[in-house]
Amino acid sequence: MASALATLQGAPLPDRIVELLPFGSGPLGTAIAAVIGATIVGSLMMTMTAIAGPWAKRKVTAAFTDRYAVNRLGPFGLVIIVADAVRLLSKELIVPEGADRPAWDLAPIVLAFSALLGFAVIPMGSGIHLADPEVGLVYVFAIASIASLGLVMAGYASNNKFSMLGGLRAVAQNLAYEIPLILIAVSVVLFAGSLQMSEIVAAQAEPLLDLGVVSIPAWYAFVNPFAFVLFIIANLMEVGRNPFDIPEAPTEIVAGYQTEYSSVYFVLIYLGEFLHIFLGGAVIATLFLGGPAGPGPASIGIVWFIAKIWAVYLFTQWARSALPRLRIDQLIEIGWKGMLVLSLANLVLTAVIVGVIA
């Protein structure tokens, strides 16, 4: 277990960067290394989100609905992302009459950066993480929950009834599903015995079943598939994708909390949505799929990690294309009467199993 932890954890990225800088390991060198590390990780996530996310969304949706999708601009239609960016950023930023301007301006920033900051403690590969605090899992859920504040701000500050309804729906939905999400994560903590993200990954490094030619790793998706399925459903509800896109619901409340946003602010909200989807995929990969663990040397762990995130993302897009939207009352009832009860049952069952094993 110790060797696995050393292989998967490594030194945080800023510590490695400090060794390459001429400033030494003093306050200046540490600060510069932290900024460079954050820029590298942030750029990786923003690139995957801004370019690959929307393009893959269109392609996957087209495949499920027997259409061609984007195929005109550039190879495989990749240049459409640049065209979309130019189109959106060149539009006029229209401020709705009667808007609470400070809150209205701040909401898109909160939505985007609350997700981006969550990647700081995710171990993406050998040494590819900004920090590794002992309460890393608590940090991820705490920082991601700030998005609820951004949704309320966007809905309230827009001075629009549809925006306000979208914000209220978002809060009701997050309250109904963040509690089950956390309870399911606690069951993983009981198995791993730690809230530290790198140790949760390392705890899954041992083989669960050795069949000689092939060994099944002790990923918690195999150890506790019930919790894995529950977490995927709760995460789908948390990020607000079909069939749980109640805060937007175009056929009911126009575009929900983002109705009055345009230009660069709409881009930030759009990026924030994709960042939260990818952050959810990163958390699922870390808690249930062994993080960056996979066949081959530890140096290609980042490749396996991104592949697992994309697997979760493709499932999200499949759900968006295949499943109809639920009503708000159905969604809340499933959250409080279904997911909460099942997550509590999973937690009790996990505690009993861990107690017997111990």
Q: What would you call each of these model-derived segments?
A:
Residues 2-358:
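Selective transmembrane helix interface/packing segments
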